Amino acid sequence: MSLTVEIVATKPYEGQKPGTSGLRKKVKVFTQPNYTENFVQAILEANGAALAGSTLVVGGDGRFYCKEAAELIVRLSAANGVSKLLVGQNGILSTPAVSSLIRHNKALGGIVLTASHNPGGPENDFGIKFNCENGGPAPDAFTNHIYKITTEIKEYKLVRNLQIDISKVGVTSFDIAGKPFTVEVIDSVANYVRHMEEIFDFAKLKDFVSGKATGKPLKMRIDAMNGVTGSYVREIFLNRLGATESSVVHTTPLPDFGGLHPDPNLTYAKDLVDTVAQGDYDIGAAFDGDGDRNMIIGSKAFFVTPSDSLAVIAHYLEAIPYFQKNGVQGFARSMPTASAVDLVGRKLGKEVFEVPTGWKYFGNLMDAGRLCLCGEESFGTGSNHIREKDGIWAVLAWISVMQHTGKGIEDILKQHWSVYGRNYFTRYDYEECASDPCNEMVATMEKTITAPEFVGKSYSSGGKTYKVKEADNFSYTDPVDKSVATKQGLRIVFEDGSRIVVRLSGTGSSGATVRLYIDSYEKENVLGQASVMLKPLIDIALEISQLPKFTGRNAPTVIT
């Protein structure tokens, strides 16, 4: 029986402008009449003529409204000329798995249902983003096109009576107004696990994890935080690498993440940190809701900053078979990320790129063959195996480094610092501040730091003096396509390489989040306590930015 396409009249909603990684709003916003339909229709239309006969991947992190949205996307895609959908079972796919599937199946792109590390549940957040045919987040030009369509939309297309059960793996074919349309519901983890087996030496890692190679099993604590990674964690760490059941926790994806805030940092992954601090563990790791972020801690909860994690993996990349085979190209980091990887790149003779915040900025460099490893201070690490950051990949990389060196995490870091020096780093987040005063703060600070007399000025605190070398509102010209991104964050660089960065974040769903980044480099004094080493620069940053005055906050919501 041929199913018919229905054209439904609609009106634009204000504010459907995708941020750094898609559109994130409260569930109550997405469930307004036609709200999700409008945005998905805009995504489909933005693909233009390429949409007809195409294959798309659909899946998300399992948060509240994920399954309903996935089923809605099936009905909209059928009506808009898509030929085939690959849908994760129950609508579940990690963001790295979507990227891998797009590339493996040469799909036109993927619609990812996630608000990443933001809380889930009926009162919390939902999100939709589009990944392009390279597997990476849509670039600015594409998301701007989506937004333009949302402001002008008058109708969307729907096959209302298309029935599909996405809880069962299998292929279902339909006739949509005389054209074939196929929905393949796939095992959420199979393709991704195969991909990891191609990158890492699972046999060697299994011998290391089980203790067969060393006589002592690797004691790990992997916390999926009730996000999408649960089933991936169980298949890889338990079934493939032979870890014990007690090595993994919170591995059932839940619509509200079991009340957890799936953001892998010292504040929200406190349960993991406390457990590893008090127990006998070699490595602890946590992931966010959609599986692209990771936090690594060593024995007794020794914290590895994301910038140090990136630098250490860069130093040991050739311990991973994928890089032995494909070679090591350049490295990159987001601008606010401490510059530890720059020092590794310099030593190894590799290009190092500094890009704006947002994983999409790494994609062009990867596609051009100039970049194979990159990371962000916001707990994102990844390589050119896909075009997204990848939490599980990062943990497998760390276990590979531990196996290769025969050392624990703290010793690996101390050896690294003895060679390269140490970037002490912290980030202060002031969440859900009033937007207008925050914008005024940034404007005032920009005026201060771009005044001609600011460069050369010295600031002193806690017995340390820092002299300003340069200061600006960071802008970036893509070396590949020459596109320009401006106003990416205020930064002050001092003569010793230390830095202060202030940004307003675009990933929250309400209010503004002010992020203050402090990066202090020490060549010799590498074993100090981070909070003590950073305090002078933090005090200077609060003085220059006048942050307490504008936000009304005397302390950050989160310290990382």
UniProtKB/Swiss-Prot annotation:
Put simply, this protein is called: Phosphoglucomutase 1
Active site, UniProt feature: S116
Transmembrane region positions? none
InterPro entries listed in its UniProt record? A-D-PHexomutase_a/b/a-I, A-D-PHexomutase_a/b/a-I/II/III, A-D-PHexomutase_a/b/a-II, A-D-PHexomutase_a/b/a-III, A-D-PHexomutase_C_sf, A-D-PHexomutase_CS, Alpha-D-phosphohexomutase_SF, PGM
Explain what the record says happens when changing I540F.
In strain: zim_48S
Top-level taxon:
Eukaryota
Q: Where does alpha-D-glucose 1,6-bisphosphate bind?
A: R24, S116, D292, R293, T357, E376, S378, K389
User: What does the similarity note say?
Assistant: Belongs to the phosphohexose mutase family.
Subunit (UniProt) = Monomer.
Q: What would be one Gene Ontology cellular-component term for the protein?
A: cytosol
Q: Which gene encodes it?
A: Pgm1
Q: Which reaction does it catalyse?
A: alpha-D-glucose 1-phosphate = alpha-D-glucose 6-phosphate; O-phospho-L-seryl-[protein] + alpha-D-glucose 1-phosphate = alpha-D-glucose 1,6-bisphosphate + L-seryl-[protein]; alpha-D-glucose 1,6-bisphosphate + L-seryl-[protein] = O-phospho-L-seryl-[protein] + alpha-D-glucose 6-phosphate
Temperature profile of activity? Pgm-A is more thermostable than Pgm-B.
Q: Which residues carry this modification: Phosphoserine?
A: S116
Q: What would changing R240L do, according to UniProt? A: In strain: dpf95_38.3 and dpf95_4.2
Q: Which PROSITE patterns match?
A: PGM_PMM
Q: Which GO terms describe its biological process?
A: carbohydrate metabolic process; galactose catabolic process via UDP-galactose, Leloir pathway; glucose 1-phosphate metabolic process; glucose 6-phosphate metabolic process; glucose metabolic process; glycogen biosynthetic process; glycogen catabolic process; glycolytic process through glucose-1-phosphate
Q: Where does Mg(2+) bind?
A: S116, D288, D290, D292
Query: pH dependence, per the record?
Result: Optimum pH is 7.4-7.6.
KO phenotype (gene knockout): RNAi-mediated knockdown is lethal. Glial-specific RNAi-mediated knockdown is viable but eclosed adults present with locomotor defects. Neuronal-specific RNAi-mediated knockdown is viable with no defects.
